């Protein structure tokens, strides 16, 4: 993953050089349950190593995770046209926690819920236009923060931190829906949203545009994207150019 420098003691201490290494092995199975609905599951083994050769207390760890996904696709009548409506969901990385210090501190995997829907509208026999909306949210509980410096504040923080450290992954998933310090507003801010438009000619040539939004307190990824694609038989090529709407975004003016 490349070299990363970690500052300690507010940047006044020594720099810890990390060379993270991640490996995952997946086995998946999918099945069509009806004419319009299908589901899939995946099992995953994860090997995670922070690569801190100068810190003997940091050790690699293993984790196991699963994904669950569903997809529905059916034709609906809109006006005089037969449109293809689709809906899907995916819950990824439901699994064990990882620890880089031998079990003293346990960290959640980045479990994520994604839901999306789309509508493909036929203009004529060769031209189609589609609109798609996706929403996603991390199913990871908010880590407690110490709010004061009194002995009572420190004791309360330690109790909450121990509870967080010992919380099971499944409990953490359910807790993530209502534990934001900012209440319901904070939960809404954790949702990432994207919308996209796609035009295609004969299912071979594609032109796309979209927008992705993430709250400024959750990562601040906000950008437009424009792209194109080409498909022939089993071969498909897609490319997109990202234009950030916020400053200091490393994704700005990058090609995917």
Name the predicted role of every residue range:
Residues 1-256:
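Subset of outer-membrane beta-barrel
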């Amino acid at each position: 993953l490349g070299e990363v420098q970690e500052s300690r003691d507010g940047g006044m201490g020594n720099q810890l050089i990390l060379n993270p290494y991640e490996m995952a092995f997946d086995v998946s199975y999918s099945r069509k349950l009806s004419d319009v609905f299908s589901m899939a599951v995946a099992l995953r083994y994860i090997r995670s190593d922070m690569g801190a050769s100068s810190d003997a207390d940091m050790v690699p760890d293993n984790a196991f995770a699963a994904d669950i996904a569903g997809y529905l696709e059916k034709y609906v009548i809109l006006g005089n046209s037969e449109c293809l409506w689709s809906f899907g969901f995916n819950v990824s990385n439901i699994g064990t926690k990882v620890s880089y210090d031998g079990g003293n501190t346990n960290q959640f995997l980045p479990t994520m819920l994604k839901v999306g829907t789309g509508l493909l509208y036929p203009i004529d026999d060769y031209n189609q236009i589609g609109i798609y909306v996706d929403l996603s949210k991390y199913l990871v509980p908010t880590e407690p923060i110490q709010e004061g410096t009194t002995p009572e504040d420190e004791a309360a923080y330690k109790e909450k931190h121990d509870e967080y450290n010992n919380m099971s992954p499944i409990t953490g998933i359910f807790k993530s829906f209502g534990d934001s310090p900012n209440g319901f507003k904070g939960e809404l801010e954790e949702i990432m949203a994207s919308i996209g438009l796609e035009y295609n000619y004969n299912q071979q040539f594609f032109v796309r545009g979209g927008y992705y939004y993430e709250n400024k307190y959750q990562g601040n990824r906000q950008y437009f994207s424009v792209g194109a694609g080409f498909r022939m038989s089993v071969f498909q090529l897609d490319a997109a150019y990202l234009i950030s709407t916020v400053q200091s975004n490393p994704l700005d003016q990058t090609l995917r």
